[in-house]
Amino acid sequence: MKESVIRKLEGLLERNEEVMALLGDASVISDQDRFRALSKEYAQLEDVVAGFKAYQQAQVDLDSAKEMLEEDDAEMREMAQEEMKAAKAKLEHLEDELQILLLPKDPDDDKNAFVEIRAGAGGDEAAIFAGDLFRMYSRYAEANRWQIEIMSCNEGEHGGFKEVIMKVSGDGVYGKLKFESGGHRVQRVPETESQGRVHTSAVTVVVLHEVPEAEAISINPADLKVDTFRSSGAGGQHVNKTDSAIRITHIPTGIVVECQDQRSQHKNRAQAMSVLAARIQALEDEKRRSAEESTRRSLVASGDRSERVRTYNFPQGRVSEHRINLTLYRLNEVMEGDLDAILLPLMQEHQADQLAALADEQG
């Protein structure tokens, strides 16, 4: 392992011991904000510190085995050869693990996310599939103990959604769901199809990280056009009695957000503003990424969201993840929320890309 990497790991080990001591300090324990921040830092250091300690121990084992090679006893030398082989293999494995653990973390990965699902080509069938994807993400969120809140929805005439925006809250939400942005294509026989022909429909998914108030970019009120209108869709006697729905247009970017899920105009406006802030931030992030990564491929879909990322073929029970050429014949499980079968390989490929980029930078 490079000396510079060893030095970095030694610094993290030192910091880990420092944080551990601080967490036992009475003045820190009484300051809840500081205690919480240090606890989070300690948890983030845990894996890399454990990996480095295991690496150090493997290095000690290798050195001991080398010393045993000097023994006169042939049996001892043979044992030393075996121990050296095992220690070298362990060091190699741990070095790979530590390289991944040291990759720069996306600061947005721990944030909550807005998931926007929109029916594209395919009419009613696209809206029905948008509803299926909403259910799939809801199941996945449930399995991860995340919370879901519907921010806005426009139901399809025959089920599903023309558009639905959900907020997903919990640990590491954006880090996992960010790979879902892009075009999702479905191939299946609609219930109304009497000839049994397979139809192809499309749905686009956009995943944006939430922008906390403290980090929110400044939005000039003069740049906003705010319209109120009457809610449509489900809602019982309340519907059409008050102009509680909100449409906000950000004039400089042309971004439009509608929220009508809450009965209060104030709540709808607050929700619309949070989605608007996320979309504007995503636009800024995309500009920055384009400048930084103009020559590097990215598994996180580009800003136009038109890239086809996945196909769901119902007659064959097949899911094809086009970005990494992954094909799974586990369609039912995926639609029931078993997304890790796709997301984990995507994350691993993303890490491999990062490692390759890091190697290029280091020359």
Swiss-Prot record:
GO cellular component, one term: cytoplasm
An example Gene Ontology molecular-function term: translation release factor activity, codon specific
Localization per Swiss-Prot or TrEMBL: Cytoplasm
Keyword Protein biosynthesis: yes
Domain of life: Bacteria
Gene3D superfamilies: 3.30.160.20, 3.30.70.1660, 6.10.140.1950
Entry keywords, A to Z: Cytoplasm, Methylation, Protein biosynthesis
Region (Disordered): 286-305
Pfam family, one: PCRF
Alphabetized PROSITE patterns for the sequence: RF_PROK_I
Function of the molecule: Peptide chain release factor 1 directs the termination of translation in response to the peptide chain termination codons UAG and UAA.
Protein name: Peptide chain release factor 1
Organism: Shewanella baltica (strain OS155 / ATCC BAA-1091)
Gene: prfA
